[in-house]
A protein has these predicted regions:
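Nucleotide/phosphate-binding catalytic cleft detector across ATP-hydrolyzing
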Residues: 1-16, 20-76, 80-188
């Protein structure tokens, strides 16, 4: 697969494991080159309930998809949908006293919000962060208008967190299968 990128995903959120491997080049749509579906054992609602069964299930699903695609994977993205997802909304404010809103202002507020959420519950790992809404001089905006003069603005973010032990157990399964997790993606 010369000059082709490979993306692989595995879905742990159902009663069946589903693994898909895609290839694509610059300017191309992804093409499915390998797929497998196996009955889940040792995993319930994206939670590892039996480590050995989970390792066997994941390994079997990966091997079948790799054979079909003729690719040996070293990294995969993991789709999860655990019932323990915690959603947190947090709004951060900034007074600008008539100066322009810049991207670094938004980045600063996001970093502060993330830090506050992490300090509030260190048992959680944030897998997704969404910008939910912006309020600029008491007016609601879907997208933040940059480079305009304002007195104050706020940014509301939504954080999706999962208990770290759930992610550690999933990581252990994939480590035992000699494959790195690229990222966790929530199906919700």
């Amino acid at each position: 697969m010369e000059n082709k990128e490979i993306i692989a995903v595995i879905d742990l959120g159902t009663s069946n494991l589903k693994c898909a491997i895609f290839s694509f080049g610059i300017g191309e749509l992804p093409k499915l080159i390998g797929f497998s579906k196996k009955k889940t054992k040792g995993i319930h609602n994206s939670i590892i309930v039996n480590m050995n069964d989970a390792i066997d299930s994941v390994r079997s699903c990966l091997i079948e998809a790799e054979k079909k695609s003729q690719i040996s994977l070293n990294k995969i993205n993991v789709l999860i949908d655990p019932t323990e997802i915690i959603t947190t909304r947090l709004t951060k404010f900034k007074k600008t006293s008539g100066s322009k809103i810049e991207k670094n202002d938004v980045s600063f507020l996001l970093k502060e919000a993330k830090k506050q959420v992490e300090l509030n519950d260190s048992r959680l790992s944030n897998i997704h962060i969404f910008n939910y809404k912006y309020v600029v001089d008491n007016k609601l905006f879907k997208d933040l208008p940059f480079n305009i003069y304002v007195d104050q603005f706020s940014q509301e973010n939504v954080f999706l967190g999962v208990p770290k032990n759930i992610l550690k157990n999933i990581s252990e399964v994939f480590h035992s299968c000699d494959i790195e997790i690229g990222k966790f993606i929530s199906c919700s």
